Every structure is written in C-alpha cells, then in structure tokens.
Amino acid sequence: MNILVAGATGKTGRRLMQALQDHGHTPIALVRESSDTSVLPEGAQTRQGDLTDLQEGACDGCDAVVFAAGSGADTGQDMTDKVDRKGAMRLIDLAAKSGASRFVMLSSVGADKPEKGGEMEHYLQAKQDADEHLKASGLTYAILRPVSLTDEDGTRQMLFGDDVDETAEAARGDVAAVLADAVSSDAWANKTMLMQSA
C-alpha cells in the first residue's frame, strides 16, 4: 500500500516510516521544504506539502493516510489551531476526496475530555475536533490515543482501552508499531483506542 505520513520527520513519524517499510508498505513522507529528510529511512519517498496550507492533490495515489504530526510543545495556540486542528481536518478532507481507504490518527490521551486538561485544554480540544471530523468523514478510520510519550523504542508489550493507566507512558517505538498495524488491520477499523507501553 502507498501510505502518506504527515509528521514523518518527527520522533514518532520517523519510526513509523521504518515500521511501514518493514510491513512491506510504501510510505510517502509529507514534508515541508525546510524539513530535515535525512532522518527518514533510506530510500523513503517524499511529497512536498505544508499542513498549514495543504494543496489539492496532497493525498492523490495514496491508499491510506496517517496523521502523526504535531505543532510541538513550544508553539502557541495559533500554530496548534493551524496544524493540529485545521491541518488535520484539511488532510482528512483531501484523503476522502482522493479515495484513500483508511485514515489513521495519532491523537492523545485526554482528547475525549479536553475541559479537564488544564494547561493542555486548547491542544486537547484541537485533537478532539480533528478526531470528531475524522469520525464524520466517511473514511474508515483508526484513532490512537497514547498516554505520555517517551523517546524509547519499546518492547511491543502494550495495553489498550480500559487496561490503560492514563498516568503511564507510551514508547514512541510502540506507538509507531501500532500505527503501522492500524493502516491495514481490520481489528482497528473505526476504533478509537487508548494505549500505553506495558
């Protein structure tokens, strides 16, 4: 499958690109002109695009799309709106228009109750808005809501759903493995799931 990955050069995205290759897929990194593509796996395909200003055709020729991007902890609410809300929603719309069969969203624990997020409320509201837009899009979707991320590769021992401790941690390597699986696994079709590393 040809799979477009938004956020491919990030800490989770680069692991996801490798995991998709390992699954036999052809991942295509959606990158800005300024992106450091040296972090991508050898031979990775790229497609130029900016989540703050996505053009028509961004998802053309892709069987599935994964949103693993984020505006980052150091950006303000304006960039959160541009990337995590509007950018994600625009990518969802373009995926649906292009005929993609599935959209996988990297969301966050707490996106189901942003009002309880304290200083994270604005970010979590943006994630919730994008998640709800995806659910209403008509696309087959998978929404992963990991707990606090670490930069570990993980052990592929994970807990999901009601078994998750929301104060626990999730290794980025484990998150990438789940996202790669969710691209094609029927077990993930139209599911929203909490996740942690065990």
PLM ranges: what are they?
Residues 71-161:
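Glycine-/Pro-rich loop/turn segments that contact NAD(P) or position catalytic residues
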Residues 4, 28, 142:
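Conserved beta-strand positions in the Rossmann-like core of class I SAM-dependent methyltransferases
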Residues 3-25:
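N-terminal Rossmann NAD(P)H-binding glycine-rich loop of SDR-like oxidoreductase domains
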Residues 2, 63-64, 102:
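Structural motif
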Residues 30-37, 146-148:
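Short, polar loop motifs at secondary-structure junctions
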Residues 8, 151-153, 157-198:
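Active-site-lining helix/loop region of Rossmann-like oxidoreductase modules
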Residues 35-90, 94-97, 112, 184:
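NAD(P)H-binding glycine-rich loop region in Rossmannoid oxidoreductase-like domains
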